Amino acid sequence: MAGWIQAQQLQGDALRQMQVLYGQHFPIEVRHYLAQWIESQPWDAIDVDNPQDRAQATQLLENLVQELQKKAEHQVGEDGFLLKIKLGHYATQLQNTYDRCPMELVRCIRHILYNEQRLVREANNGSSSAGILVDAMSQKHLQINQTFEELRLVTQDTENELKKLQQTQEYFIIQYQESLRIQAQFAQLAQLNPQECLSRETALQQKQVTLEAWLQREAQTLQQYRVELAEKHQKTLQLLRKQQTIILDDELIQWKRRQQLAGNGGPPEGSLDVLQSWCEKLAEIIWQNRQQIRRAEHLCQQLPIPGPVEEMLAEVNATITDIISALVTSTFIIEKQPPQVLKTQTKFAATVRLLVGGKLNVHMNPPQVKATIISEQQAKSLLKNESTRNECSGEILNNCCVMEYHQATGTLSAHFRNMSLKRIKRADRRGAESVTEEKFTVLFESQFSVGSNELVFQVKTLSLPVVVIVHGSQDHNATATVLWDNAFAEPGRVPFAVPDKVLWPQLCEALNMKFKAEVQSNRGLTKENLVFLAQKLFNSSSSHLEDYSGMSVSWSQFNRENLPGWNYTFWQWFDGVMEVLKKHHKPHWNDGAILGFVNKQQAHDLLINKPDGTFLLRFSDSEIGGITIAWKFDSPDRNLWNLKPFTTRDFSIRSLADRLGDLSYLIYVFPDRPKDEVFSKYYTPVLAPASAAKAVDGYVKPQIKQVVPEFVSASSDSAGGNATYMDQAPSPAVCPQAHYSIYPQNPDPVLDQDGEFDLDETMDVARHVEELLRRPMDSLDPRLSPPAGLFASTRGSLS
């Protein structure tokens, strides 16, 4: 109920937005009287697109109706009597509305609760950060709403003027008919005697002169009314076009940009509900003005009067048609983007939505949407309106979907749930470009009929660029292409042009955004971390971040050329760091236990003056995704020790916390935190000796323990034969089963008589292998090499 209490505190525009959420589909009184019950139900646990969850949705509907009926029965007194009737009516209404579509009730209530929470959150953020001052966003939204009010008033004014014109014209036509009747009477005068004819003719002439003078004046008045009305429509359309530009070219483009950055881990793009409400208001006002213009044209055709009006009306009619065309085509958008790294033969989903579908009654004749994959060059040709002859660059299964209208939320959308890219056709690559740098896009297209088929629009929209892969080993480099494109794409670009070079601070922002999203942590990259990355990328020794602010990073430096002295690119190393943190060390990173971004020399400088047993965890330079332990311990040979890096494979066998727990001579986490205080909550519980030795099915369960034999002997010598750490006896080496193949073992369709041979996919794999073979042996990505230590007899050696 706390959510509803907060929602009731909303004021101004936020309160109006909340009120719009309710209506006949879900009355606000139901929300009020069943607030606690509604907020305690598992609405989010139901997948509205999964038919198997329908029974649960039906049960929630039945429970809602029962709760309403119980609430109604408990009402007493005079006021209670009216409320009892009203709640009972709502119970019946909801039962009838959602009985055949209980999923729509779930969708409706989720939509309401989500937007209530959003409005409350925005109101709280606004009040805490800006106080009584209205922030820039609210100010802009206020201006948009004020313009809508102005448009409503001028549209009402032209409606009144049109009615006035129609009434004036109808009276004019009546008088014109009277003039024709008088002319007919002149023809009948010959049948009268001369005296009566003369008398009658004089009266008719006076009447005719008076009437013709009136008709001439009224014709001028009518023409003036028509011109004034057309001029008012011109001004209205100017204001409409300006408002539409703000909404479509500013607000909607900003939403799309947020959606693109969300692909890099940025904050969610936010709800489309406010944008849809604006677009629907635009559609409503545009359609009202279009109908007015058509009625004005009809009046002109009914009573032609020479003048400039016909040309003016033709111009405003063409203008309003252009405006509505731009609105319909621009509001056909991709609400849920397909994955930007798209693997063949893998199911994927996407959702497209028409923001004006409800207002323009497009849903009355549900349109079908088709999805195809096209190349970057085909996308360029499409935007130039060049004929592509329905060309595509691959085959997508389940690529057609009918748009559905959801009454509760007022949304018209098509949900592609089970698409799959069967095959891809690649273009010839340029220079050093690899297959993971080639961009495609999913084209969604449909046809919408508006206003009883008065207008028919062919609509198309392109997804964000996608990189197609055929093997998981290509994922890392494909992600680099997507990251660079999402971060540095410019508005209104030619598909899919991106700058080849960007400033280092720009890349820092993109890396930090991606890092926090992948590791799912609020602990991002610090200034010191960014200095370390700059040193690594630019092969520099400067420790001042400002020294790098004017330096540029090229795409080749980022993920095409190996770092100087290493067999990997900058991105491959950074991606390996994110992967190992995401899979194994999120809590340790969030706790600040992993220093990470320091090199061997920096670790030496940090530890040299610390007590024995002080250690730090840093990311390995020599192995992608490796974490090494550096610690201080004085011995005859050395005082700083570095353990051979552990990788994801090692942490799958034994966790970092347990490995640190095994090494009792590691005492303090740098700078001075007791190890057990930091890591003990992550230790695997140790079995009691009796239970550990107990045989299970005739077998005694072994235990794996981390030891460093070389350090044990060194520390024994240092202790003068009275070793403190001799309880860390060497244990038998535990070696994982060797895997020599680069790719998982998949059935070969060439050798399998029942298999389907796919030439495109086979060529794609061949290109990938060709890329590997082109590289010198020392430049191979370690993730594609045989596992480190595969032929070693022990693990945990020192360096």
From Swiss-Prot:
Forms a homodimer or a heterodimer with a related family member. Binds NR3C1. Interacts with NCOA1 and SOCS7. Interacts with ERBB4. Interacts with EBF4. Interacts with CD69. InterPro entries: p53-like_TF_DNA-bd_sf, SH2, SH2_dom_sf, STAT, STAT5_CCD, STAT5a/5b_DBD, STAT_linker, STAT_N_sf. It comes from Sus scrofa (Pig). The modification Phosphotyrosine is found at residues 90, 682, 699. GO terms for molecular function: DNA binding; DNA-binding transcription factor activity, RNA polymerase II-specific; RNA polymerase II cis-regulatory region sequence-specific DNA binding. Belongs to the transcription factor STAT family. SUPFAM superfamilies: p53-like transcription factors, SH2 domain, STAT, Transcription factor STAT-4 N-domain. ISGylated. One of its GO terms (cellular component) is cytoplasm. The modification Phosphoserine is found at residues 128, 785. Transmembrane segments: none annotated. GO terms for biological process: cell surface receptor signaling pathway via JAK-STAT; cytokine-mediated signaling pathway; defense response; development of secondary female sexual characteristics; female pregnancy; growth hormone receptor signaling pathway via JAK-STAT; lactation; lipid storage. This is Signal transducer and activator of transcription 5A. CDD domains: STAT5_CCD, STAT5_DBD. Residues 589-686 form the SH2 domain.
